[in-house]
């Protein structure tokens, strides 16, 4: 199962960290390139995290997509 996150702020970072350090089974997490510093940090921290080229790639390649953007 591939998980995707559109939005890479503090909330997405916390949720992704929680998923990656839990026993939840997933293939990879594809994240938005919007916040480059947070995205790069998550990719370095967790080997299953991949930075997408754009948000459409997240929608196309993920089974579940989480919207973590400011309303």
Regions found by a protein language model. Give the residues of each.
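Rossmann-like NAD(P)-binding element
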Residues: 49-71
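NAD(P)+-binding Rossmann beta1-loop-alpha1 motif at the extreme N-terminus of oxidoreductases
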Residues: 1-57
């Amino acid at each position: 199962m591939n998980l995707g996150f559109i939005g890479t702020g503090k909330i997405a970072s916390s949720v992704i960290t929680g998923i990656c350090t839990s026993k939840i089974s997933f293939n990879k997490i594809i994240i938005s390139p919007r916040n480059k510093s947070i995205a790069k940090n998550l990719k370095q921290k967790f080997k299953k995290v991949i930075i997408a080229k754009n948000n459409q790639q997240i929608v196309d390649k993920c089974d579940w997509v989480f919207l973590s953007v400011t309303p």
